[in-house]
Swiss-Prot record:
It is found in: Cell inner membrane. It is an enzyme of class 7 (translocase). GO terms for cellular component: plasma membrane. Gene3D superfamilies: Cytochrome-c3 Hydrogenase, chain B. It is a peripheral membrane protein. Keywords: Cell inner membrane, Cell membrane, Membrane, NAD, Quinone, Translocase, Transport, Ubiquinone. It comes from Rhodopseudomonas palustris (strain TIE-1). HAMAP family: NDH1_NuoD. The lineage of its organism: Bacteria, Pseudomonadati, Pseudomonadota, Alphaproteobacteria, Hyphomicrobiales. This is NADH-quinone oxidoreductase subunit D. It comes from the Bacteria. One of its GO terms (molecular function) is NAD binding. Its EC number is 7.1.1.-. It holds the Pfam family Complex1_49kDa.
Length: 402
């Protein structure tokens, strides 16, 4: 009689559920359609595009200067890193060299962006698996870093601080001193987070051996950044293809060996320490005699003259007017430039037709390649592991949907 009541295998169907787009663990407007066999994930289908604004098409209708703010709105957790890639691409086409002080300021703020991103990711990943204290600590430090953004550019998030040929304005000495003081205090916060999470039994159970990627699989899927380093490859564009002044800076590239969520967490923790190390070196070089000087190229066909000069010189006024009405013209050609953004390799493929607007600007967002592997990473795991895997990918939808 008991056997008759038991359902046969054919009548047990998989069921489909929606995860997001308003789920707090979805990290933005992600919708996952999950096919489950009981608690086990059979298939994951990410539905993207809910934050699509047509950024690449909009850039084609703007001058090179007007295009910069669009890059802040891609990975809006670490905005200046994206501006960096675009400015480097335009500079390569123009064939101009950025002054040394501007390079140091750019690298300093790129590393601040890296810490902003990793702090948010590590602490919200902990929240995804049930720890509520880390986000409170992380946001306290992020607030201080956003104040540094604001003091340099006037904006906490969408800075638009980098310019083709340098940065918009120099850093006041007091700001450099305050960043230096923050760098001295921050490692203690990372150590506190480390003590709270790294040996926590529940955190390890939720992350160890979850979302494992071998190195060959990582290359096949087009992974970059932490996703590749977690699988054992010391691939970091700051070391392997140095840009700006990274070649003269001393820092380590942390790598994992298991390729799971726990290794990726550890790499982000160590990268924050290395970023502080880079920032300290940049600050020392900014204070040194050879770190003084202009923060932008001295070419008024690319960067406008100073206000004082415009009050004295008609030629300077004409340069200013032409720059802000028409913009500068970039020689025809095409170039691909990639930077090591916090999420991975952020690339800009820029095509110029010799006019004052980009003919095409293709954006290579690292999060896009990582999210497309969500089905491969989650298959066979439990439903509860999906949010842990998603957290370890570090997805931001500004850059995925663009």
């Amino acid at each position: 009689m008991a056997d008759a009541a038991a359902p046969d295998a054919a009548s047990v169907r998989n069921f489909t559920i929606n995860f997001g787009p308003q789920h707090p663990a979805a990290h933005g407007v992600l919708r996952l359609v999950l096919e489950l066999d009981g608690e086990v994930v059979e298939r994951v289908d990410p539905h993207i595009g809910l934050l699509h604004r047509g950024t690449e098409k909009l850039i084609e209708q703007k001058t090179y200067l007007q295009a910069i703010p669009y890059f802040d709105r891609l990975d809006y957790v670490a905005p200046m890193n994206q501006e960096h890639a675009f400015c480097l691409a335009v500079e390569k086409l123009l064939g101009i060299a950025v002054p040394r002080r501007a390079q140091l300021i750019r690298v300093l703020y790129a590393e601040i962006g890296r810490i902003l991103s990793h702090l948010l990711n590590v602490t919200t990943q902990a929240m995804d698996v049930g720890a509520l204290t880390p986000p409170l600590w992380g946001f306290e430090e992020r607030e201080k870093l956003m104040m540094f953004y604001e003091r340099a550019s006037g904006s906490r998030m969408h800075a638009a601080y980098f310019r083709v040929g340098g940065v918009h304005q120099d850093l006041p000495p007091k700001l450099v001193d305050d960043i230096d003081a923050w760098c001295d205090a921050f490692p203690a916060v990372v150590n506190d987070l480390d003590r709270l999470l790294s040996d926590n039994r529940i955190f390890k159970q939720r992350n160890v051996d979850i979302g494992v990627v071998t190195l060959d699989q990582a290359w096949s899927w087009g992974f970059s950044g932490v996703m590749v380093r977690g699988s054992g490859a010391a691939w970091d564009l700051r070391k392997s293809q140095p840009y700006e002044c990274y070649a003269e800076l001393d820092f380590e590239v942390p790598i994992g060996k298991n390729g799971d969520c726990y290794d990726r967490y550890h790499i982000r923790m160590e990268e924050m320490r290395q970023s502080v190390r880079i920032m300290k070196q940049c600050i020392a070089k900014l204070r040194a005699p050879d770190g003084q000087g202009p923060v932008v190229v001295d070419d008024h066909k690319i960067f406008p003259p100073r206000r004082g000069e415009m009050k004295r010189s008609m030629e300077a006024l004409i340069h200013h007017f032409k720059l802000y009405t028409e913009g500068f013209h970039v020689p025809a050609g095409e170039v691909y430039v990639a930077v090591e953004a916090p999420k991975g390799e952020f690339g800009v493929y820029l095509v110029s037709d010799g006019s004052n607007k980009p003919y095409k600007c293709k954006i290579r967002a690292p999060g896009f390649a990582h999210l497309q592997a969500m089905d491969f990473l989650s298959r066979g795991h439990l439903l509860a592991d999906v949010s842990a895997i998603l957290g370890s990918l570090d997805i931001v939808f500004g850059e995925v949907d663009r």
